[in-house]
Amino acid sequence: YAGNKDNLSSIEENDNYFFIKGDISNEKVVQNILRQHTPDVIVNFAAESHVDRSIDNPLEFIKTNVLGTSNLLNETCRWIKSMSIEAINDFKFIQISTDEVYGSLESEGSFSESTPYNPSSAYSASKASSDHLARSWFKTFNFPVIITNCSNNYGPYQFPEKLIPLMVINALSDKKLPIYGKGLNVRDWL
């Protein structure tokens, strides 16, 4: 919902660019993409990603973020078994996660890789679940997984429901600026 294919127009002519609209929870779609394109790296950006939406429709987040990620992991793990040893050694699966899996940041301190997960919404719980699945594929199948925990990202083309665009649009429109909880949350921005 938040993506806009027009944002990719500057790379559409690249030989290694392919746009495929599909559902990562669909085994056949994933199998066909892997066979047709034989990627060296898979970066899993596919996610339902807005906390407020996860309150209204948590099952959609579980479907995409948990079931979809598990299907992508499973099908990719099956697929790489057909690759040469050299290709397997070079292959990477990058799971894009979120800092939300750690819960709320206190006014002092920061998160690290050893901070325990403490998700507080269906969104963060679904992303924590997908991270645990990715780790389990790494440990069980020696599957080459890297997990990143991005903080709040901001930049051109960001969907207007995200915090910075929402605050700017509301301020320019003389609308109320939403305050979450007691307004004491601390967030990192990239």
Q: What residue spans do the PLM features occupy?
A:
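A conserved structural motif in NAD(P)-dependent oxidoreductases
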Residues: 188-190
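Glycine/proline-rich active-site loop of Rossmann-fold NAD(P)-dependent oxidoreductases
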Residues: 128, 153-166, 173-175, 179-184
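N-terminal Rossmann-like NAD(P)+-binding domain of SDR-like oxidoreductases, especially those catalyzing
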Residues: 1-153, 173
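Donor nucleotide-sugar recognition loop
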Residues: 66, 185-186
